[in-house]
Amino acid sequence: MGQTVTTPLSLTLDHWKDVERTAHNQSVEIRKRRWVTLCSAEWPTFNVGWPRDGTFNPDIITQVKIKVFSSGPHGHPDQVPYIVTWEALAADPPPWVKPFVHPKPPPLLLPPSAPSLPPEPPFPTPPQSSLYPALTSPLNTKPRPQVLPDSGGPLIDLLTEDPPPYRDPGPSSSDGNGGSGEVAPTEGAPDSSPMVSRLRGRREPPVADSTTSQAFPLRQGGNGQFQYWPFSSSDLYNWKNNNPSFSEDPAKLTALIESVLLTHQPTWDDCQQLLGTLLTGEEKQRVLLEARKAVRGEDGRPTQLPNDINDAFPLERPDWDYNTQRGRNHLVHYRQLLLAGLQNAGRSPTNLAKVKGITQGPNESPSAFLERLKEAYRRYTPYDPEDPGQETNVAMSFIWQSAPDIGRKLERLEDLKSKTLGDLVREAEKIFNKRETPEEREERIRRETEEKEERRRAEDEQREKERDRRRHREMSKLLATVISGQRQDRQGGERRRPQLDHDQCAYCKEKGHWARDCPKKPRGPRGPRPQASLLTLDDQGGQGQEPPPEPRITLKVGGQPVTFLVDTGAQHSVLTQNPGPLSDKSAWVQGATGGKRYRWTTDRRVHLATGKVTHSFLHVPDCPYPLLGRHLLTKLKAQIHFEGSGAQVVGPMGQPLQVLTLNIEDEYRLHETSKGPDVPLGSTWLSDFPQAWAETGGMGLAFRQAPLIISLKATSTPVSIKQYPMSQEARLGIKPHIQRLLDQGILVPCQSPWNTPLLPVKKPGTNDYRPVQDLREVNKRVEDIHPTVPNPYNLLSGLPPSHQWYTVLDLKDAFFCLRLHPTSQSLFAFEWKDPEMGISGQLTWTRLPQGFKNSPTLFDEALHRDLADFRIQHPDLILLQYVDDLLLAATSELDCQQGTRALLQTLGDLGYRASAKKAQICQKQVKYLGYLLKEGQRWLTEARKETVMGQPTPKTPRQLREFLGTAGLCRLWIPGFAEMAAPLYPLTKTGTLFKWGPDQQKAYQEIKQALLTAPALGLPDLTKPFELFVDEKQGYAKGVLTQKLGPWRRPVAYLSKKLDPVAAGWPPCLRMVAAIAVLTKDVGKLTMGQPLVILAPHAVEALVKQPPDRWLSNARMTHYQALLLDTDRVQFGPIVALNPATLLPLPEEGLQHDCLDILAEAHGTRPDLTDQPLPDADHTWYTDGSSFLQEGQRRAGAAVTTETEVIWAKALPAGTSAQRAELIALTQALKMAAGKKLNVYTDSRYAFATAHIHGEIYRRRGLLTSEGKEIKNKDEILALLKALFLPKRLSIIHCPGHQKGNHAEARGNRMADQAAREVATRETPETSTLLIENSAPYTREHFHYTVTDIKDLTKLGATYDDAKKCWVYQGKPVMPDQFTFELLDFLHQLTHLSFSKTKALLERSYSPSYMLNRDRTLKDITETCKACAQVNASKSAVKQGTRVRGHRPGTHWEIDFTEVKPGLYGYKYLLVFVDTFSGWVEAFPTKKETAKVVTKKLLEEIFPRFGMPQVLGTDNGPAFVSKVSQTVADLLGVDWKLHCAYRPQSSGQVERMNRTIKETLTKLTLATGSRDWVLLLPLALYRARNTPGPHGLTPYEILYGAPPPLVNFPDPDMAKVTHNPSLQAHLQALYLVQHEVWRPLAAAYQEQLDRPVVPHPFRVGDTVWVRRHQTKNLEPRWKGPYTVLLTTPTALKVDGIAAWIHAAHVKAADTRIEPPAESTWRVQRSQNPLKIRLTRGTS
């Protein structure tokens, strides 16, 4: 009890040295990690019974060995060493294995005797319990002697025995009574445990007629006393390993423990051992806590008394004697409480999603599925599935979660509500048993396929016959045309034969005989007439000849395929169809029939075989065929060959031209020249290494790599995205790939909650498709791992220049070499249907899929691990790996060939496959990662250059980003790339206006030109030091990294980068320090920490060692010193002068300068500015600024004083900071001392530093912070810097603030501080910010009165004041009309208040001037404000109109859809028909809101009952405006009227009926308690049809001429009144009554129509605003203005909006508002000669 369990796997790991010795004896090698993986993960999946902990059973080992040694693709040759070693350990076991080897039957042994306890007098049997059986009375038999096994060995076979609990062996029987003598073996078998009995049954011959008994830890012995038999270790081991954990399946483990408690009667210690073995520590504590909660007190309720709880369920070992009645009672009670604790602790939190996730399996019976469903209810919900109240929920779950075919049929059962759960199970069983077998399904699919093929074959034959018949008919017509043409040529025209004389022969043209007597005419039978040749060149110009085959080619222009005729005689290419917008350029085209002017198209993007280009075509509609001219043929690099089969147009390399589309970053591959390898792979390399090539070795499998387990994020849930629609061409294109992957086992069928769509991608240049899975949603839910894929930027740094023989290998289908663990395969499922293969469901990958975000990293790491031994074994070779691209470099050709052979052998042995087509073996020049490697240097390939050069001028930010991204890949070859591209980068920012100007075009051309002249760069040699030449210009760092090659310096990389805003504002010497630091950090990626010598035209080392603290912050200073003063890695060379073009040193020396001196001179703004007092100063002033809080408001003031008096003081606006006030005071002092010598004292460090140091720094960096934002107090700083130059001589001195001395400095500072506080407290601060350089405000001298102003003033009675030089009215100067307009317009722009509110504000406020024409000007401003017109609401002045109604029932209907929630049985909508004459309503519940539903109900419900309607009125819903509905209406002659959009009053009758029906349904559901609104709909319709209308009549009375049947229902016995005269009279009077009702109603409706309606005031040509019905955040309420084109009394149509607009949704626009831009109309021709195209443009 409590001992550690030993398994075969752990046993082998503990004796691993012996295992390796056994493997060595078998001549194999094994690895410990691989040993564990195969035993615990791989071999259990063979389904031969191999346990995860291993076994030494020879039968199971043999089964696994058969699987491993299986021939073909299903074998596992890599696992042979391991299974052979397992077999050797089992066949010849070492001493530590022997106890675990499957035993042979031992000789007969007597069973051991059980220890007995001292006898006690018999005791009464405890009362029987429903949980535990009664103990049987002891048998009076003598126990047989028992031979105990060796204590050193295991008691039982831990691996071959079945786990308890055991089946009850049944009641024991005995033929004789016990005695004191020796008892025969057949009568006195002792009590033993079931395990011992089972072992004895296996290892001993069975004992005949032996007495059987129950073996428990507590059992009653032969002497009446209880004996204790502890649990065996094998019981506990088997219970734990053959049952799920408590957290996984608490019900199953609880049932196991319940059976153990029931049958074994364990003691308190046994219970603790059982719980400790089967439960975790946390689970055990939870069970014990729940059990203690279940302890009940004397009242039968759970108690909280600790004494009672500890007595009933102690946590420490109690003193319970199981040989006493009391002790056994305690144990029984303890077990009951323990079982209750297990049940309560096993209850999971309520999780209905878990219940919903239980679905029926493909081959699972309905009854088994129902049991699983009920178990889920018990486990994850607090409901009991057996409770009758929960039967409905369980039944619904059973229906919805059954198999799709069973669920659909169960949903269609009649009277589904009355079905019980048992009825549903029986129906499901019937459906399940009637399913077709797999053989029947295959037979059905085969039969359907054959029928489909037969129909297709018949259709093809019919089409072929029709095509032949049509071809023969056309050929006959053609022959007739040819022959008739030839006859006409012979009979007339210039070719008519001369007229014969009367005696002239028509055959030989001689006279004297006729043709029938001509001796020269051949005699004999007439031969067959030769067929007319239509395609010969010697046909003498006969009519009707078919032209020779014309070379054609299909290109994609503007995204559409266009078939061109190749015409080398055409200079330009021609389009005949309408190409869209045309440019303003035109050209004169000279053709065979004359000349004509045609226009050019705008630039179109054309997909060529050489890439995407933009091209402008001539639009010639008269041309019979689109022409491919010489200009585009030149871009295409086309070649035309004339052969016997006709003309062929091919590309530059002889390949057929096709439509091509690809990513822009891969475009360089289009220009690559496909050169075959120098070494013939087919002869030697392919045959020597067949397993290393994909062409000969098949699909690879990295068998050394364990299956990959993909980890999900903690909050991830399965995502299911349906498959996108796929064309037939694409489906047929990817079908062979799917079939191939299925045959190879890479794809397998599955059922998964995950699903992502499959995308067919067409391969460039071919018609082949390849399947690509969209795994973006899966990638979002998978855990991110750190990417370890090498950086291509510095990957080649590990390739020394001495290795100049290269081999490049590209692994094919690399990701498919790694296996996926079965638990992770379901993540990558997708849909696939193929009736021919019998597949209709999901497929998933068993290998690592492409498109998965972690695939490159996982494969790169796996390949690195597998190739680690190769790198160790070949230290002289350089092997670089970038995912699946390998580069092997050697110093000689022989080493390269030997290394390549070893690498191919290694790859083949490891299970990887290389592509022979892409292999470059043992060459001195190879292409790797888009670069050309040759002689220790790397070049830009011509393909990459042509890619950049072939890109058109960018027109959008996206195109510019594409260009910069493509060119940026080549920036190492372009000196100063960052400086060249500087004008381009601002245009790529979001929200920036894309304006391509001369600067951008110049930068664009410079980058292309630099790319054409790109030099070769040497590969970094890590054995040599590096030299970095750095220069800086206008905030851009430029440098070149070089290495010595003999006497020369060979460039390794060109570097350039833009400095940050702070560094860009420094003096030149400090900018050089920043440039060196930036480039040194970038260079570290290439130098790999090797020594670096920095050469620059500045003494940088001295600046770094003693940096000026005025310019650099401490953090930046520390960073620069740590980076540049690392003497072990970075050294500074002598100062050199650099060539601006090459960045290399010039032969002559540059100008010498001292950087420290220059910095000292450049730190200030004014050179003579000092901080020491001037002895001859004209003034000595003190400045101060004060900012403080007073009564919750921040007050501020500034002052300039002497020691005794205030020179200047002013209050500043509220909220002004103290720093700003100090700047203002200092600036004011400098301005007042213009042209004088000044000493000025300030106690502000901020103002003092700004004037002396920081102001100049801010100015140099553009007044920006380190984050690129604008600094605070920008205007005040600029004003201060400008004012520094006003005094003749200046000294700004800092003095401590708040001094208490009596010297002049302290007195002046106190005076300035006091003056600033007093002025801030005394004066009211201004409402606007003080501007240093503010223009003077308007005064009366600026008033200029116009002639109109003077006339208005004269009428007003104003007088002119000569003294004030202005007009005066009511004692106030009069403001001119123009000034009034400017002031009021500015005020309105700030507030956008209405006329009345603005006027009220002006009247309440005091104004020192009188505003001339204030009210008129203000009204004009408010009425013409465009923003107010677009936003302000407007009251509708349109009066309500009158609806048109029918003249009799059934002629005029209004229709509408309304949504009813919640939906029931799939019904979500209600289709409502209302007869406008009578108000009669018909309503139908529908599942969809479609035109098909409308027409179906109209034809099947309305037409048969009410006749064909004449008018239908609806809104503009999709179901009513669709072509289906309108076509049906046209065919039936129905006038379908569409009402105004967003105007429900137009359909007011049906809209009101919708509301009535919904309100009635709501009341009915509340009254009845039912949610079935479909069932309650007839009652709602009954109410609507019997509700009196406006004229006091109900729709029922109007329609049927009788009162509504509300109370007097007819007698059920209708036979009595069938022939009643009163009934007949009533029926006869019905016709008359209806007419008496209908005529007055029709007259009343007509009277409403005849009543005059006041129309809206809008007329054709007016300008109106249109209401925006769906506004977004901060979007104006009105749009426009628009021009009115058509009007009706209630609606109007405007220019630019297709639908009619109700007059209530528009408002007049003021004509003075800026009108919309004038439109110009352009007429264009179309393909149809009877149509023209009108295009409107803005002039």
From Swiss-Prot:
Gene3D superfamilies: 1.10.340.70, 2.30.30.850, 3.10.20.370, 3.30.70.270, Acid Proteases (2.40.70.10), Gamma-retroviral matrix domain (1.10.150.180), HIV Type 1 Reverse Transcriptase, subunit A, domain 1 (3.10.10.10), Human Immunodeficiency Virus Type 1 Capsid Protein (1.10.375.10)
Compositionally biased residues, Basic and acidic residues: 435-467, 487-500
Annotated lipid attachment (N-myristoyl glycine): G2
Biased composition range(s): Pro residues: 111-127
Domain Peptidase A2: 562-632
Organism in which the protein naturally occurs: Friend murine leukemia virus (isolate 57)
Active site (record annotation): D567 (protease)
Chain positions of site Cleavage: Y132, P133, F216, P217, L479, A480, L535, T536, L660, T661, L1331, I1332
Segments forming domain Reverse transcriptase: 742-933
Gene from which the chain derives: pol
Protein name: Gag-Pol polyprotein
List of residues binding Mg(2+) 3: D1456, D1515
Gene Ontology BP annotations: DNA integration; DNA recombination; establishment of integrated proviral latency; proteolysis; symbiont entry into host cell; symbiont-mediated suppression of host gene expression; viral genome integration into host DNA; virion assembly
Any one GO cellular component localisation term in the record: viral nucleocapsid
Positions annotated to bind Mg(2+) 1: D810, D884, D885
